[in-house]
Amino acid sequence: MKFLVDVRITDREAAKPYLPAHLEYLNRHFENGDFILFGAYVHGEGGMLIVQSESIDSLNLLLQADPLKKGNCATWETLEFRVARAGTNLAD
């Protein structure tokens, strides 16, 4: 299953100490294949992920480990979707 995860930082100052660990978390799950794509919003108030997960329950367990979640300084909205087409230039 594929999920779009919209992450919104609710308190920028409170989030600052968690950002290095959050980036490490993102990279670790990208390297192991859980996260297909991730990036920050240009305005700096969060970002989004495309995640491969077996179920919404396993996705929620994965998201609970995010340092921003542990710091209670961000919110998450998750939406399941089906890929219809994908370009090769996503990183441009």
Predicted regions and their residues:
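Conserved, structured core segments of small domains
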Residues: 1-92
